[in-house]
Amino acid sequence: MSEIKLNYHKTRFLTSAANIKQLPEDSGIEIAFAGRSNAGKSTALNALTNQKNLARTSKTPGRTQLINLFEVEPNCKLVDLPGYGYAAVPEQMKLQWQKSLGEYLQKRECLGGVVILMDIRHPLKALDQQMIEWAVSADLPLLLLLTKADKLSQSARSKTVKMVREAILPFQGDIQVETLSAQNKLGVDRLSAKLDAWFAPNFATE
């Protein structure tokens, strides 16, 4: 099979769901984007798709409370999961989000991979590690994307990547670590190549 290369610039908004029960049919391949409320998820999705307003960004962390689905091509979807861990969100709502996230990662059959976004200056917080555990226990491949990479010098970036790669060894899953800066598009090509690989089974010839 020749390598597929999807055009993420054609991605369009599909639908929003308040919980897993409201999601569309469990078919095709979905790739989920998860992260703390200030990790830059919406900004990363906008950089990937080269669309300024595809995923709505906000100065108020925790605004994305719904599961938002975007279609790259038929049967190829990106899923923007609710941001987790923001202090100003009521405890009850936080617990509800965490329950939904765990349920989605464990039960969604068409989930082909998970991108966990973390601010490169504050990686691997407790809730990030919880998400990694859930994904690994569900046998899902993971990409840990260290965002806002332009905030660090190149040597500090390399050092952080090395530290994160060593720290995740005990999880023993299929986990890769990359950096991303939406500001100067650093790492967007590597992100799209990883997504292409995860979507590839959709295009396998019979």
Curated annotation (Swiss-Prot):
GO MF assignments: GTP binding; metal ion binding
Residue ranges of domain EngB-type G in the record: 27-201
InterPro entries cross-referenced by the UniProt entry: G_ENGB_dom, GTP-bd, GTP-bd_ribosome_bio_YsxC, P-loop_NTPase
Binding site residues for GTP: 35-42, 62-66, 80-83, 147-150, 180-182
GO biological process: division septum assembly
Cofactor: Mg(2+)
Disulphide bridges: none
Keyword annotations of the record: Cell cycle, Cell division, GTP-binding, Magnesium, Metal-binding, Nucleotide-binding, Septation
Keyword Amino-acid biosynthesis: no
Recorded superkingdom: Bacteria
Binding site for Mg(2+): 42, 64
Gene Ontology cellular component annotations, sorted alphabetically: cytosol
Function: Necessary for normal cell division and for the maintenance of normal septation.
Family in the record: Belongs to the TRAFAC class TrmE-Era-EngA-EngB-Septin-like GTPase superfamily. EngB GTPase family.
Protein name as it appears in the record: Probable GTP-binding protein EngB
Species this protein is from: Actinobacillus succinogenes (strain ATCC 55618 / DSM 22257 / CCUG 43843 / 130Z)
Gene from which the chain derives: engB
